[in-house]
Amino acid sequence: IVDALVEAAENGKEVVVLVELRARFDEESNIEYSRKLEEAGCRVIYGLNGFKVHSKLCLITRKTDKGLEYITQIGTGNYNEKTSTLYTDLSLITAKQEIGKEAAEVFACLLRGETIEETHVLLVAPKCLQNKVLDMIDDEICHAKNREEAYIGIKINSLTDKVIIEKLVEASQAGVKIEMVVRGICCLIPGIPGYTENIKIISIVGRFLEHSRIYRFGTPEREKIYIASADFMTRNTIRRVEVAAPVLDDTLRARLDEMFDTMMKDDEKGKELTSNGTYVDRRVNAEKLDSQELFYEMAYKNAEKKTI
């Protein structure tokens, strides 16, 4: 990717790159890449004062007869050749102009050394992610209180954000069905009568490091679904620049739904968190299901077909 950006700059394209020098384990290589990019003529900026930039965002802007046209890539994982072979991540490439316009505003704010104050499509921390997640949880609470089916599905690495945890407890008490895949630290205990009996939490630790983040709100006919760079940790939701993008294409939405549902059925590497705080083996399927191996086989076959 660095080589491609260098080539673009050398071919006369305007290239702006934000490099977070505080990226753990990658500080030295990021400094070297920054020098290489600057030497090629790229404009390089180094994060945001007071906030770590953890979003993974690429925006291509083209001038056409009709004006500016955007192509946006938003991911859950870093542009890192080493971790990309070890981590599971998701990436969205879209020509949806409403997403591109807000991505452009994110970059504009970063160039000014500011955080974005308001969004309509993207969820962008530190000011426009946690509050919007809480609003979507509240929507499900309202549906449940009206005796309508309500659902929340979350896949993240860690859950420590007290405000979101308390809202999820409130949702469970209202009758919202909540399913969560939380790989690492989890400060919410499911299955406690009167509090979290409607919450199921599993952790998947397997061949690859689970790293993708998925947010699902609502039943199929009104579902909102996002992929994100942010875990539900206070450091992510209010102390970092993070981006979550809505998945608007029906085919991709169905694919994400299927992936999430498959992970919730994983009884090979998936362990269920119980009400006493321990993780236990589970048996869901007639034959053991390893979601990572299943997705790997699917990806391998699709790569052979050269299809997505």
Spans of features found by a protein language model:
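Gly-rich Lys/Arg/Thr-decorated short loops/hinges at beta-loop-alpha junctions or inter-strand turns
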Residues: 113-122, 147-149
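PLD/PLD-like phosphodiesterase catalytic module centered on the HKD motif
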Residues: 7, 11-83, 93, 98-100, ...
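Short, compositionally biased "basic patch" segments
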Residues: 98-117, 132
